[in-house]
UniProtKB/Swiss-Prot annotation:
Source organism (scientific name): Bartonella quintana (strain Toulouse) (Rochalimaea quintana)
Matching HAMAP family: RecO
Lineage: superkingdom: Bacteria
GO biological process: DNA recombination; double-strand break repair
Entries under SUPFAM superfamilies matching the protein: ArfGap/RecO-like zinc finger (SSF57863), Nucleic acid-binding proteins (SSF50249)
Similarity comment: family membership: Belongs to the RecO family.
Designated name of the protein: DNA repair protein RecO
One GO term describing the cellular component: bacterial nucleoid
Function: Involved in DNA repair and RecF pathway recombination.
Family matches, as InterPro entries: ARFGAP/RecO (IPR037278), DNA_rep/recomb_RecO_N (IPR022572), NA-bd_OB-fold (IPR012340), RecO (IPR003717), RecO_C (IPR042242)
UniProt entry keywords in alphabetical sequence: DNA damage, DNA recombination, DNA repair
Length: 243
């Protein structure tokens, strides 16, 4: 068995005295692991950092085997990532979420957002928006996607300002006004893609929205608390956006 594809490095762990087990995310093969022989060497250390973009070649005698990786560097983002705390936290959060998904199952839309994030990690607003979109897509991939296409009460497709915490469906301004204290705010960049720039309150409301449904459907059923890296990241965004 053999494949070759571009990949983002997610993490490593030691394997024996000189090798490592590498974890990557690819578009066509999903989250994949394999052995990198000699990966524990100083020469390989810079290449194998989380966030780096590589050409990964994997092969094994049988598909169910762990297999071996051969890598070629494409974009070594990691050296710049460590200079930006919010970008580093963001990558750690993405990796946390990707590990909730089955290994070796393709999730091309999540990979595309991850790749776009890596290309824009030094732009805070783009970075934050992509993270909200990533969490929205994660909910969808796990079977808990929100329906933001029309108002749950009236069927209208305009002025969708809220989301019902019970149904996960959008609610328009008119229908939601009497109940707005009990509804979640719907960030407009999730329903009106042309909005630029995305504003601070929309970003925070986006994290509140995705966090509510991730807690209900993903974290609590698995006995997981909201990851501390997510809390720290949102606090960093708040400080940066208010400067």
């Amino acid at each position: 068995m053999k494949w070759k594809e571009q990949a983002v490095i997610l993490g490593t762990r030691q394997y024996g005295e000189t090798s490592i087990i590498l974890e990557v995310m690819t578009r066509q093969h999903g989250r994949y692991m394999g052995i990198v022989k000699g990966g524990h060497s100083r020469r390989m250390a810079g290449l194998l950092q989380p966030g780096n973009f590589v050409e990964a070649e994997w092969w094994a005698r049988l598909d169910e085997h762990l297999g071996l990786f051969r890598l070629e560097a494409l974009d070594l983002y990691a050296a710049r990532l460590i200079l930006l705390p919010e970008a580093l936290y963001a990558l750690q959060l993405i990796v946390f979420h990707l590990r909730l998904l089955p290994e070796r199952d393709p999730y091309p839309s999540l990979y595309d957002i991850l790749h776009l994030f890596m290309q824009n990690f030094d732009e805070s607003f783009v970075n934050a928006e992509l993270l909200v979109r990533f969490e929205m897509r994660l909910l969808e991939e796990l079977g808990f996607g929100l329906d933001l296409s029309r108002c749950a009460a009236t069927g209208r497709q305009e002025r969708l300002f809220y989301v019902s915490p019970k149904s996960g469906r959008a609610v328009c301004e008119e229908a939601g006004r009497p109940w707005k204290e009990k509804l979640l705010t719907l960030p407009q960049f999730l329903v009106r893609r042309a909005i630029r720039p995305v504003n601070f309150s929309d970003i925070i409301n986006g994290f509140i929205l995705t966090g509510f449904f991730l807690m209900r459907h993903v974290w609590e059923p698995r006995g997981i608390k909201q990851p501390s890296v997510r809390v720290n990241l949102i606090q960093l965004f708040e400080r940066r956006f208010r400067m």
